[in-house]
């Protein structure tokens, strides 16, 4: 009898313990010692111990706080959050593994199970929205194939995307939505010759079907923009390339996208993201000026704007500020992929921006543009391969947000001081004269200008005051 009582007591204890385990909230520990459950329906916490990130001011030593970005603070007539419109990039944040051409993955995130299953895609989506909410932003960006896996057929792949998009819609609620969506038209071997510029009509048609579906998903999720990045739209050698035909094909593809956008009632902005090379030797949307010329040639200039990525600017031999100004003065600045490159390497490193000087110049363009809405700042940036702690995801985004916030504060100083604006105004003040006004109005012919040149004699050419401009700029940093 004693043995039976002990057995019953043991069973009762096991029942109580198991009940407590079942009743307790699930969590996904932010360390490598524990993995999450396999179920795609798992709804526990992915970032336990990491609170919602708050503004604590520049004296704070807390790495999980904002020092310069204060979302509700008004600067130059707008709240900081409205100037910035920060967005999380799903691909770098939740698909970046740390792998590179010389090494395998280094980031063993605790929620990953090593598969590219639909269940895993749903779990990543849950992690994505917990991250977004704790970071305190309202926007995110995605490629179709990053959020949902490829299947054997296009129909099956579309079904996968539908399931994940339906979950994303539920998790978004009413506050969060995509800054932009796009189709991944570069990873699969079918796109090795390009997508819209492929030499194979079957690939062209497949790419069109993929963009059609991605545009529908973006629209359904309330996305404000749709991006075209032509990573394979270019060539490796001109010896086997009909450039004119490929450019015409790309234009027809974009025309079809414009038509479909209007057909489904998508009111968002279509964006082209320039990049000079990588993975192709030469991409057709080399830089902002090249992209603008393409749009003008094919009558698409009023249908698209540009998504400027700072690291792409440096690869094309320009500063980010140059590309932003080129886009802005053309009326084409629509969005910024906020990152930076390493000046000592020649490839796209996609680093988080931490240079205060560069951030200030970026924000000069944004303020001159009156903001970016309906665009914003997408953090197309990834952790370094050696950064492997879950909290590093937060630290990197916080640092990038604070850097751009400091840039905005510095621009406010420059505008309020007025010295730099005055220096530039004085440099061009000779064009504020009667003859200068006629030149700018297109009413001064060569005969008139020749007469003035003879009347005035040798012109006096004043100093450009570059060093003074640099001094004024640095004083605001």
Predicted regions, residues:
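N-terminal signal peptide
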Residues: 2, 14-30
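Conserved, mostly hydrophobic/aromatic
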Residues: 88, 132, 207, 218, ...
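N-terminal small/glycine-rich loop or linker at the start of catalytic domains
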Residues: 82-115, 182-198, 230-237
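Gly/Pro-rich active-site loop or hairpin
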Residues: 99-123, 241-247, 281-292, 305, ...
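Active-site acidic/histidine proton-transfer and metal-coordination neighborhood
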Residues: 40, 125-127, 139, 149-306, ...
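Catalytic domains of carbohydrate-active enzymes, especially glycoside hydrolases
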Residues: 80-86, 116-146
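Flexible, acidic glycine-rich loops studded with aromatic residues
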Residues: 331, 350-477
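Classical eukaryotic N-terminal signal peptides for Sec-dependent ER targeting/secretion
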Residues: 1-10
């Amino acid at each position: 009898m004693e043995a039976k009582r002990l057995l019953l007591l043991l069973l009762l204890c096991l029942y109580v313990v198991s009940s407590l385990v079942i009743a307790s909230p699930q969590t996904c520990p932010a360390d490598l010692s524990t993995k999450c459950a396999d179920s795609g329906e798992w709804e526990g916490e992915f970032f336990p111990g990491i609170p919602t990130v708050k503004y604590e001011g520049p004296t704070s030593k807390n790495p999980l706080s904002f020092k310069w970005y204060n979302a509700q603070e008004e600067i130059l007539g707008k709240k900081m959050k409205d100037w910035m419109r920060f967005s999380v990039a799903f691909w770098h944040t939740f698909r970046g593994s740390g792998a590179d051409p010389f090494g395998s993955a280094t980031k063993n995130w605790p929620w990953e199970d090593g598969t590219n299953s639909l269940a895993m895609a749903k779990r990543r989506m849950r992690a994505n929205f917990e991250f977004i909410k704790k970071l305190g932003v309202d926007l995110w960006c995605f490629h179709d194939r990053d959020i949902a896996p490829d299947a054997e057929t296009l129909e099956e792949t579309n079904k996968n995307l539908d399931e994940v998009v339906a979950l994303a819609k539920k998790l978004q609620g009413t506050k969060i939505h995509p800054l932009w969506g796009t189709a991944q038209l570069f990873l699969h071997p079918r796109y090795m010759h390009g997508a819209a510029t492929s030499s194979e009509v079957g690939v062209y048609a497949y790419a069109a079907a993929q963009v059609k579906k991605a545009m529908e998903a973006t629209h359904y999720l309330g996305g404000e923009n749709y991006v075209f990045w032509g990573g394979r739209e270019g060539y490796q050698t001109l010896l086997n390339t009909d450039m004119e035909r490929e450019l015409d094909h790309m234009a027809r593809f974009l025309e079809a996208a414009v038509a479909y956008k209007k057909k489904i009632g998508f009111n968002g902005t279509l964006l082209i993201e320039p990049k000079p090379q990588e993975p192709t030797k030469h991409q057709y949307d080399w830089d902002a000026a090249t992209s603008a010329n393409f749009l003008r040639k094919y009558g698409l200039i009023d249908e698209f704007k540009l998504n400027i990525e700072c690291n792409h600017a440096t690869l094309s031999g320009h500063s980010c500020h140059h590309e932003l100004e080129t886009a802005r003065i053309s009326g084409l600045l629509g969005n910024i992929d906020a990152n930076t490159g390493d000046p000592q390497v020649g490839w796209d490193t996609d680093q988080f921006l931490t240079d205060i000087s560069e951030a200030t110049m970026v924000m000069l363009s944004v303020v001159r543009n009156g903001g970016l809405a309906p665009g914003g700042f997408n953090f197309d940036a990834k952790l370094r391969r050696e950064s492997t702690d879950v909290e590093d995801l937060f630290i990197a985004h916080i640092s990038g947000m604070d850097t751009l916030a400091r840039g905005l504060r510095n621009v406010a100083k420059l505008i309020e001081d007025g010295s730099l604006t005055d220096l530039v105004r004085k440099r061009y003040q000779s064009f504020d004269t009667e003859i200068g006004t006629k030149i700018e109005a297109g009413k001064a012919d060569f005969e008139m200008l020749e007469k003035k040149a003879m009347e005035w004699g040798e012109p006096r050419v004043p100093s450009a005051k570059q060093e003074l401009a640099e001094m004024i700029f640095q004083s605001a940093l």
